Amino acid sequence: RTDLACTFMCGWPWLRHGATHRIVAAPVPSADYAQGRPVYCSHFIVRADSAFTRLEDTFGRRFAYTIEDSHSGYNAPRHHLMQCRGADGRALFGEIVGPLTTPRRVLEAVVEGRADVGPQDSFAFDLMSRHLPELASRVRIVASTEPVPIPALMASNGVSPAVIETLAAALCSVGERPELAGLSADLCIRGFARLDPASYAIAETWAREAEARGLATIR
């Protein structure tokens, strides 16, 4: 669509498909991992009542993922896991479960015992922890990736620069408006910030590094 004014989009597929949309602003999560920046990470989760205490404890078991072109649901976990892969190239997991498409479905697969470990987009997990605490409390985080730029609100190139600037200014003022504090709390954000498009290049760098180490796919 040429008239798309504001949609939440993952930076890695955006970059891979030619970066044809323009960044409006990005959320700044209120969680500690963000440290006041528009970043997020991937958490590796296990069932809360499981015996797993480290990511390495899950090797040989079942790993769930969202989709292969997701940064948080596949690319970032793959890059993290390349550090654990031995020189013999042996598979880390006994079974790969997916694609499950969404973080919630990965979480549900772990809770229901269909998988032993899986990644969570940290921002999505923040939201589920706030709004679905009975579900999110049934898992534990055993490891997290390094934070990278978070998905942003983007607009089509057909939207005028003036409209994009107006939207960006309004979004970036959210953290300074006390009347929006309740909404910000429900969204698990401090506010919004502008984001340099070039910062998303880290996702492609991680992909190349994992592929160079023989981890084109998680296994």
For each predicted feature, which ranges?
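Bilobed "Venus flytrap"/periplasmic-binding protein-like clamshell domains
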Residues: 10, 29, 33-106, 182, ...
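Glycine-rich nucleotide phosphate-binding loop and flanking beta-alpha elements
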Residues: 12-14, 52, 126, 161
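Short helices/loops that flank or line small-molecule/ion binding pockets
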Residues: 1-19, 56, 102-123
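Generic secondary-structure signature for well-ordered alpha-helical cores
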Residues: 172-176
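Periplasmic-binding protein-like
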Residues: 25-43, 131-171, 186-198, 202-204
